[in-house]
A protein has these predicted regions:
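Extracellular glycan-modifying ectodomains
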Residues: 1-387
Length: 387
């Protein structure tokens, strides 16, 4: 018995030495493609950092992030948690039928931030309506999959009340048309309208919302059943997979929709990104070989993306979209209607939106955000003034 104990101790010490040695010898990684985030760097060793505790915290984060074979350990940990029937893993919920869900609890909701964001949009709409017809200003909140696909959630999942906040925010919006897409999405909850391993909606979910928005604004749209589906990849694992790192996770498909000529909407436009880069499509096929394949839509998020669509039904209409990443799958459809579209992402744009609208002769405005992003966003104040 004593011999076995000694052997186990030797094996354990050797294992620790191997992991520690490997971690020291291996070059630090700056970015984890699997987790889709930058990893911690060594903390600065200063007296102030030691006394404040920043050095100790930074060292803990650094050692955790740079441990040898980190991705493998996380995968093993996830496997053990799943074997123990744990559905709360890495800040996400493991649901039914291969669906994972973003975990945003009631405690994560900042009521004061919501009030600030609502006020910013209210003020923006009031100002925009001085130059744009109110009927051409619209507001669209996208529900997260946890609301639309609640039947796929694991038992005892705690999520903030999306319906309550969508109702509350929509009722406060004036000087605009409010497009509520919940009923349309809920009626298709058995369809593939949200990715299983990512927090975004699929192109089908986005198109259903686009149809609803067109109905609300008086624009034309082609029935979904009449469109041609074109699959770009069947090997997508998104943001929720990056949190959980489950080796058994499903792969998602990414696709576009087009007309009977097999041409995807948004694939034959002229784009200018951040006033510099030029391209001729809303789709970046190079991203399909990368980890974050959702970047297939526009290549990434940018401060401004200007789109010119020569085949649009209304060449005299110029749409401004204030957006988060959920708009990236939505906007290509709008190229069928608007001769010009500009997307502004306030996370990366520091200009004056009012001046931009005047300079570019904007005729229509859409504010499109996912509800989770809207209630937590800290950049919407940019709508009503300079930085």
């Amino acid at each position: 018995m004593k011999k076995i104990s000694v052997t186990m101790i030797v094996i354990f010490v050797a294992f620790l030495a191997l992991v520690s040695g490997g971690s020291l010898l291996m070059k630090d990684r700056e970015f984890s493609p699997n987790e889709n985030r930058y990893l911690a760097e060594p903390p600065r060793l200063t007296v102030d950092n030691i006394l404040s505790g920043k050095f100790q915290d930074g060292l803990e984060n650094y050692l955790r992030d740079q441990i040898c074979f980190r991705d493998g350990w996380i995968t093993v940990k996830t496997g053990i948690q799943k074997a123990c029937k744990d559905t709360d893993i890495g800040g996400a919920y493991v649901g039914k039928d291969g669906y994972d869900f973003e975990k945003i609890t009631p405690e994560d909701v900042d009521e004061k931030q919501i009030a600030r964001n609502v006020k910013a949009v209210q003020d923006f709409f009031a100002k925009a309506s001085e130059n744009v017809e109110k009927d051409r200003i619209s507001f669209l909140l996208v529900p997260s999959s946890g609301l639309v696909m609640a039947d796929k959630l694991p038992a005892h999942a705690r999520l903030f009340d999306q319906a309550k906040y969508i109702d509350q925010i929509e009722k406060q919006m004036k000087d605009c048309r409010v497009t509520d897409v919940r009923e349309k999405l809920l009626s298709h909850s058995e369809d593939y309208i949200y990715y299983k391993t990512d927090h975004h909606w699929t192109s089908e979910g986005a198109y259903l919302a686009y149809e609803t928005w067109c109905d609300s604004t008086g624009m034309e749209s082609t029935p979904l059943a009449d469109l041609k589906k074109q699959v770009a990849t069947k090997k997508f694992r998104g943001s929720l997979y990056s949190k959980i790192l489950d080796a058994d996770s499903a792969y998602d498909s990414i696709w576009t929709y087009g007309d009977t000529k097999q041409k995807a909407y948004g694939s034959d436009c002229s784009l200018t990104i951040d006033e510099k880069k030029q391209t001729d499509s809303c789709y970046d096929t190079a991203q399909l070989s990368q980890k974050d394949k959702y970047k297939y839509f526009f290549g990434d998020n940018y401060g401004t993306v200007q789109i010119v669509s020569d085949h649009a039904r209304h060449q005299d209409r110029n749409l401004l979209v204030i957006k988060d990443s959920f708009a990236n799958t939505f906007v290509p459809f709008a190229t069928e209607n608007y001769g010009q579209i500009t997307m502004i992402d306030l996370r990366y744009y520091n200009g004056n939106v009012e001046e931009y609208m005047k300079e570019h002769k904007i005729t229509d405005v859409l504010v499109l955000y996912n509800i989770t992003n809207f209630i937590s966003d800290r950049n919407l104040y940019k709508l009503v003034g300079r930085i």
